[in-house]
Design a protein with these regions (language model features):
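Non-catalytic linker/capping segments at the edges of enzyme domains
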Residues: 1-73
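Active-site helix/loop of acyl-thioester processing domains in fatty-acid/polyketide metabolism
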Residues: 41, 73-91
Length: 91
C-alpha cells in the first residue's frame, strides 16, 4: 500500500505552543474526570478546518490496567471520544 499524505504534517505544529490549556477547554467541553480526553490544543487553522490537540496519558488512566496489561493501548472508543471532544472544542 502506498504511503498516505498527512492531514497535517507534524512539522506544522508545536506541542509546546499551547493555544488552549485544560482550563480553556473546560469552558467549552462538559466532560470531566475520567472522561476528559484532551489536555491541550496546540494548533488551529480555520482556513483548512484543522485543529490539533493532545492528551497526556498516565499510568492512572482507568483503562490502562486492563487494556492491555502487558502493553497498555488506548482503546479505540477513547480515541473516538478524544476526536469528538476536539471537534466539540473547535466548533
Amino acid at each position: 500500500m502506498p504511503p498516505r499524505d498527512y492531514i497535517i504534517h507534524p512539522s506544522e505544529y508545536d506541542l509546546e505552543h499551547v493555544i488552549a490549556d485544560i482550563h480553556e477547554i473546560r469552558r467549552w467541553n462538559m466532560q470531566r474526570f475520567e472522561m476528559e480526553q484532551l489536555t491541550a490544543i496546540v494548533h488551529e487553522d480555520q482556513s483548512r478546518g484543522l485543529c490539533v490537540g493532545y492528551k497526556d496519558i498516565t499510568r492512572d488512566e482507568f483503562w490502562v490496567r486492563g487494556h492491555f496489561p502487558v502493553m497498555p493501548l488506548m482503546p479505540g472508543v477513547m480515541l473516538c471520544e478524544a476526536a469528538a471532544q476536539l471537534s466539540s472544542y473547535y466548533t
